[in-house]
């Protein structure tokens, strides 16, 4: 029995599982029969190509099935192989999924489905199933460990419709230093969007919307820190960025209504109930929309 067979001899993962099948194909390759020959460069292209073929044309139902397979693979797979290979395999898979969802498709429906399918794991940043905290490389290359998180990528590209969904699920509130996201929105240089060729004016409008959304989530936004960066020679993407940060986030007392929103959202966030838990509250629809960052 070959070493690769010994490593992957038992599994509780069904044969129809995309990731189990992909792993089987990799370890059965003649060139990978001995551990000493295994290397990132040997299997990364095959993993990427296999998943890219699916993700390029997948619809929401197909993406749902793919995420279900990945969750089952991570949770139930009985495969046994070296820790380094396990890390490489899962990171390549996650990098490919995030790359296609955020950098290639840029579809809010796919982003929301990813958040819904993995929300039970989001409180543990180290979990392989907490996909929203994993990093990916926006211009695909086999180096997922040196990438950025989806939230930072969306802030860089100012995709306001996707940014809003991430915030509704409490992703910004979970950030240790949310001011870094604000700084990215204001100061990060314009970059070419992969999927949609929009005018610079549209990017400016999206940046304004992203700033407004941040003000609905945060109680404090350090304008002083932004100005410090400007004094060092950095240039804002919108000249009137100051107009989109309420004075109650950096100078005047914060509104009581906004503090109530933050308190309720924080309680729901603690119980992993954002955003669905908002709509189970017995309050008027307008207040539900306020809590859900619609207004």
From Swiss-Prot:
CDD domains, per database record: SOCS_ASB_like (cd03716)
Biological processes per GO annotation: intracellular signal transduction; protein ubiquitination
Tissues showing expression: Specifically expressed in testis. Not detected in other tissues tested.
GO cellular component: cytosol
Keyword Transmembrane helix: no
Keywords of this entry: ANK repeat, Ubl conjugation pathway
Origin: domain of life: Eukaryota
Transmembrane as UniProt keyword: no
Biological or metabolic pathway of the protein: Protein modification; protein ubiquitination
Gene3D superfamilies cross-referenced by the UniProt entry: Ankyrin repeat-containing domain (1.25.40.20)
Coiled-coil spans in chain: none
Domain SOCS box: 232-295
SMART domains to which the protein is assigned, alphabetical: SOCS_box
Per-repeat ranges for ANK: 146-176
Role, per record: May be a substrate-recognition component of a SCF-like ECS (Elongin-Cullin-SOCS-box protein) E3 ubiquitin-protein ligase complex which mediates the ubiquitination and subsequent proteasomal degradation of target proteins.
UniProt note: domains: The SOCS box domain mediates the interaction with the Elongin BC complex, an adapter module in different E3 ubiquitin-protein ligase complexes.
Family per record: Belongs to the ankyrin SOCS box (ASB) family.
Protein name: Ankyrin repeat and SOCS box protein 17
Source organism per UniProt: Homo sapiens
